[in-house]
A protein has these predicted regions:
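A contiguous, well-structured pocket-lining segment that forms one wall/lid of small-molecule binding clefts
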Residues: 159, 170-174, 181-183, 401-439, ...
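Conserved phosphate-binding/catalytic loops in two-lobed NTP-binding clefts
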Residues: 454, 473-485, 684-687, 694, ...
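A phosphate-binding glycine/aspartate-rich beta-alpha loop in the early core of alpha/beta enzymes
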Residues: 75, 211, 219-282
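Glycine-rich phosphate-binding/hydrolytic loop that grips phosphoryl groups
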Residues: 482-504, 508-510, 549-558, 665, ...
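Conserved phosphate-binding catalytic cores of ATP/NTP-utilizing and phosphoryl-transfer enzymes
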Residues: 257-263, 309, 330-337, 363-364, ...
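Intrinsically disordered, low-complexity, mixed-charge
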Residues: 1-174, 178-185
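Internal gly/pro-rich beta-alpha loop/helix module
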Residues: 314-390, 580, 584-585
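Short glycine-rich phosphate-binding loop at a beta-alpha junction
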Residues: 213, 445-457, 681-691
Length: 738
């Protein structure tokens, strides 16, 4: 008889892991205990060697939402144990692992439709495989009395399910039904509703084309039909959202397949417990008021029982978007939602439940890049889980960058990145950013010993970092923007030694004080050498030109000495020649903007990346492309690629707009491949917001791999600024490791 101490790390809390272990122990005739210690599960298991090995094999093979990322095993001496049981939860001895919110599972949806089940018609049913966790937890260990469900005592039926090891709701802390759980309430301008009547009213209003304000799992959302032009247009005006696409919620996977071309992998992503917004190739056209001039359609499946019932009742795609003005913090508190409802006369009804949301979580956004999943927004389904669990020791706060606000906390060998659902342009949003970060410190039990931010001296994220460091008396560090992007890939994959990183994005403060963004970096450890980049040109407007693609185009034409019939061209040339409001830029994002504008695909970015997305959409419609000639040239020890040559060649080429758009993409791939061969390093990193371009990333990866290069990209955090805090934190930990 042997005794093993098994330590399991990963997604093992709030997902029915302890009941699963008890069932597996019984099946393998194992005695012992299982205990949750602050998100790390410790199992004492006694049995024969064969039984123990088989037992551990079944643990490793556990199906989602359980994810055992790491299992440590040691043989110990222990007195004989008579049976196997789950013992009381303990406190956290190391950096904790909190459970994430998970979308409603198929079993709970089936229960809601079964008149014989006591969960029938209940819009907030959940089990160990689904439901809220992160948004309702107060502290570890994860037990009901330390969640927002503590005010909802279990009824007899739910108590029976909670205690039964054979039930999938065993120890599901969010367990509830219509008899004991949070109640659905509905408000209209004239009446108040509850429970089934409120659900029926929500369906009736939405079916008629009304806009609803709905309390979802992680905050309030605006919901309406996606097939009504007037309704979608009204929602745009309400949100002050001129062009950014809306996502559509489909009632089930069959409806999703009718609207988008989905591979088996994309179906798996869409139906996963994360319940993300998936960007996929559209099968049919959507209303221009929903989405236009973008290569992919955002779609999702219901994440809660309420949404499942609503979508089923309406039987049409639903627009679902966060309830706030663009850039403002997501509304998640009831009093704010009621004030918002009262102020917006176009909202026909408010539908909510009487349980508090303790912290917000927006929908995650994902897409498939070839065979690889790419995360574009890492929120519900992931937060607050770490992406690195064996980092160097040290505690640090990284404050990210301004374009996609977020932060990362490090401690106990784990790295926890978080995106904050707002911008940080005003005091209210900045206060929300700091409030969220401090909440995470308390939640995770971490006390940063340093703060690290972006190198840009005027970034608000840096100013917030400096303020935090100053108020707490902590040392303050900075790291260059594109270096941090590269380090985010290195951190994810635990890479050591030299790597050649291509970091392409819209903007980032360079070490020479100019705007970088088309970077080729040699990285090793914490060192970075800029070995190549786009040739810098003088650009009008600095970072402000990010929204005005026409300025990028005219700046490039002026730099190339090419004529333009645009009536604004003389003014731009005059400003450039007199150095009025100009800055040197090597930004790849601005080169994409310039190409889109010169091909007539867009002059303004009404939302981030609009013109480059239009360029990508056009390129994906082409079957072949004219050859565009450009090449890198060595200058002052660096390999420079001149965007003026590329654009001049593009304008002189023959073909349709779509073919020229494809030619532009192929030229950027040629830049990557040729540069990789020039420097000869076998390991290539691709990061930065430009690599959310599906066509660019897929073709670049394919071309590099065909030539024998190993290619690494961001897989656990976004390639854009939403993932940059991870790289910042990694820089500090590596720089200060003992």
């Amino acid at each position: 008889m042997l005794t093993y101490r098994i330590t399991a790390l990963g997604r093992v809390q709030g997902v029915g892991f302890r009941p699963l272990i008890c069932r597996l122990a019984g099946a393998h005739h194992i005695t012992g205990t299982v205990r949750n210690e602050g998100g790390v599960v410790t199992i004492i298991a006694q049995g024969s060697r064969e039984a123990l090995l088989s037992f551990m094999g079944d643990i490793r093979a556990a199906r989602p939402p359980v994810e055992v990322a790491e299992m440590r095993v040691e043989e110990i001496a222990h007195a004989p144990l008579p049976d196997f049981r789950a013992v009381s939860s303990g406190g956290a001895a190391r950096a904790p692992l909190f459970p994430a919110d998970l979308g409603i599972c198929e079993d709970c949806q089936a229960d809601m439709k079964d008149p014989k089940d006591h969960h029938y018609g209940y819009p907030y049913t959940s089990c160990t495989a689904c439901g809220p966790r992160y948004t309702m937890i107060e502290a570890l260990p994860y037990d009901r009395e330390r969640t927002a469900m503590k005010d909802f005592p279990l009824c007899k039926d739910c108590e029976k399910e909670y205690q039964s090891l054979s039930d999938r709701r065993c120890h599901a802390e969010s367990i509830a039904c219509a008899h004991c759980g949070p109640r659905l309430k509905g408000w209209t301008r004239e009446r108040r509703f509850e429970k089934e009547v409120a659900m029926a009213e929500a369906i009736r209003l939405a079916k008629e084309g009304a806009i609803l304000l709905v309390k979802a799992m992680g905050g309030y959302q605006l919901v309406c039909r996606g097939d009504r032009k007037e309704t979608a247009g009204c929602l745009r005006r309400m949100k002050h959202r001129s062009g950014k696409p809306f996502a559509l919620m489909m009632k089930d996977i069959d409806m999703a397949k009718a609207w988008a071309m989905l591979s088996e992998k994309e179906i798996e992503m869409l139906t996963s417990p994360v319940r993300p917004i998936l960007l996929a190739s559209p099968r049919r056209k959507v209303l221009p008021a929903v989405a236009s001039r973008v290569p992919r359609l955002g779609l999702c499946l219901p994440s809660t029982g309420f949404y499942s019932l609503l979508a089923e009742g309406i039987d049409a795609p639903l627009i679902v978007t966060s309830a706030n003005q663009s850039g403002e913090p997501m509304i998640f508190r009831d009093e704010e939602a009621r004030a918002y409802y009262e102020a917006e006369e176009d909202i026909a009804g408010l539908f909510f439940y009487d349980r508090e949301i303790l912290r917000p979580a927006d929908d995650s956004v994902m897409q498939l890049q070839g065979r690889e999943v790419q995360i574009l927004r890492r929120t519900r389904g992931f937060l607050p889980e770490p992406v690195v669990r064996d980092a160097p020791s040290g505690m640090v706060l990284a404050t990210g960058a301004d374009m996609a606000p977020g932060f990362a906390l490090a401690g106990g060998g784990s790295l926890y990145p978080a995106e904050v659902p707002c911008d940080i342009l005003n005091e209210r949003s900045q206060a929300f950013f700091l409030e969220t970060e401090q909440d995470w410190e308390e939640l995770l039990g971490l006390s940063p010993q340093a703060v690290i931010s972006d190198l840009h001296p005027a970034y608000l994220s840096r100013l917030l970092g400096e303020k935090t460091a100053r108020e707490r008396g902590l040392p303050f560090y900075t790291v260059q923007h594109h270096h941090a992007h590269a380090l985010s890939v290195i951190a994810e994959h635990h890479l050591q030694g030299k790597s050649l990183a291509f970091v392409f994005d819209g903007t980032g403060y360079g070490e020479d004080g100019t705007v970088w963004g088309g970077e080729i970096l040699l990285c090793e450890g914490t060192s970075m050498q800029r070995v190549g980049h786009l040739a810098p040109i003088s650009m009008i407007g600095g970072d402000a030109s990010m929204k005005q693609a026409w300025k990028s185009a005219l700046s490039y034409l002026a730099a190339a000495g090419l004529p333009s019939k645009d009536p604004r061209a003389p003014l731009i040339r005059a400003a450039l020649s007199h150095h009025v409001n100009t800055i040197k830029s090597s930004s790849m994002g601005r080169l994409f903007d310039a190409a889109a504008a010169l091909l007539g695909l867009g002059e303004e970015n009404h939302f981030k990346g609009e013109c480059p997305m239009a360029l990508e959409a056009a390129a994906m419609a082409a079957a072949h492309a004219p050859k565009i000639f450009w090449e890198g040239k060595e200058q002052d020890g660096r390999l420079l690629w001149d965007g003026r040559t590329l654009l001049a060649s593009l304008l002189a080429s023959h073909g349709t707009i779509e073919e020229k758009a494809l030619a532009f993409h192929e030229a950027i791939v040629e830049m990557i491949l040729s540069s990789a061969e020039h420097f000869g390093l076998p390991r290539i990193l691709l990061s930065g917001g430009c690599f959310s371009n599906q066509l660019l990333l897929m073709r670049a990866r394919e071309a590099l791999q065909k030539r024998g290069f190993s290619v690494y990209t961001n897989e656990k955090v976004p390639p854009g600024d939403g993932g940059i805090a991870l790289g910042q934190a990694w820089f500090y930990l590596m720089k200060n490791q003992k």
